[in-house]
Amino acid sequence: QQVPTLARRMLKKFRGIYAASELDHARLLELGCPAERIHSTGSIKFDVAIGERCTEEARTTLREDLGFSAGDKKVFILLGSSTWAGEEIALLEAQRTVITAGIDCRLLLVPRHAERAPELLQLLKAQDLPWYQRSTGGVVPENLGIHLADTTGELAYLSQTADLAFIGKSLAPNDGGQT
């Protein structure tokens, strides 16, 4: 119940939001996004074959596999998609703000360049939340706060777990978005 209130406040700050599907359009409406700001565009990636959406059961399993389960409790997953230097700090601050508001928020970080992992590990080591580095393999601990997906080719798959996605290179001083 708290998630929609927070999402509604955040979504009202956007001039326009582009939904990749009718399902995404409906979810944005449910979160309280003003209808006049939602534009259904379909996928704007013209060179990528879109796979099937995972079922709700598969989504739950994927969340558990990422260490983002909390039993019957609702977990809000924030995705940092194709992030660039400096954006992870903003995402960690956003996560902290949401947690302070009483919402169980987990962060899935997928940097644009996996070779930035050493830099990101230094940042994660300073956090007070349990984290995991995907490229190390092995057993993912349960009840993670942050999952660093420093792997290549998994973004579309991992994105299906998110409740809200931040797209990298969209904060100042960056200009022009992803290339």
Predicted features along the sequence, with ranges:
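Short, intrinsically disordered, charge-balanced linker/junction segments flanking boundaries
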Residues: 176-179
